[in-house]
């Protein structure tokens, strides 16, 4: 009988990262999460390279059906972040006077990610009561516990580049374009949840993850 295996996978990045939005990706904007289907596809492509004798026997359906993954969201140290709920998430700041509603609304609107404990409390009907030092320096990340004011989970940078046509084509038809890159803080990165009941398949997936750590997700 297969044992039940569930893992938390953390991805750390030593350099810049651009997360595309699909076939029609505009390079001047990077996503901040890696969607679950992208993670699964990257794992399958690596699985076919590492285990060709297994992957060539089928169309991939047994592989995709053997495990589940979440999308990859930001983390900082031990703090796991979830996207802020679209509705009903109403934090109060104990160090901002209640009558200063515009300031509270401004800070609340800017929040995009919520720490696990605060998110879990909200799911159970408890609205967050926090202070301004629960926010990172960008105001986008709301930590479950107070943090240093200058904490940066991630920053963005837009760089101009030039596309040069392949040799033999119209070499004069160069095209400038912009690419946005993400830089994660020293203790930050992306995480996702991996749910794989089969121990043998889990071991293979872990091997594929180590390979992806060297070659990237694409």
Indicate residue ranges for each PLM-predicted region.
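Conserved active-site/ligand-binding neighborhood in enzyme cores
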Residues: 1-218
């Amino acid at each position: 009988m297969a044992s039940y295996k569930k893992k938390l996978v953390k991805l750390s990045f030593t350099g810049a990262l651009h997360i595309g939005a699909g076939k029609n990706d505009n390079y001047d904007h990077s996503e901040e999460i890696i969607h679950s289907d992208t993670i699964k596809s990257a794992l399958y492509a690596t699985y076919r390279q590492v285990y060709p004798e297994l992957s060539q026997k089928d169309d991939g359906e047994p592989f995709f059906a053997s495990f589940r993954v979440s999308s990859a969201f930001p983390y900082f140290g031990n703090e796991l972040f979830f996207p802020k709920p679209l509705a009903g998430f109403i934090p109060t700041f104990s160090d901002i006077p209640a009558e200063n509603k515009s300031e509270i609304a401004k800070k609340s609107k800017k929040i995009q990610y919520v720490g696990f404990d605060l998110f879990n409390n909200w799911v159970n009907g408890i609205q967050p009561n926090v202070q301004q030092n629960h926010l990172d320096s960008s105001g986008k990340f709301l930590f479950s516990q107070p943090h240093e004011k200058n904490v940066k989970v991630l920053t963005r940078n837009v760089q101009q580049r030039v596309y040069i046509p392949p040799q033999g084509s119209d070499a004069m038809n160069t095209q400038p374009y912009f690419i946005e890159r993400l830089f994660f803080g020293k203790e930050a990165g992306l995480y996702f949840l991996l749910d794989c009941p089969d121990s043998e398949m889990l071991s293979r997936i872990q091997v594929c993850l180590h390979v992806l750590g060297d070659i990237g997700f694409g």
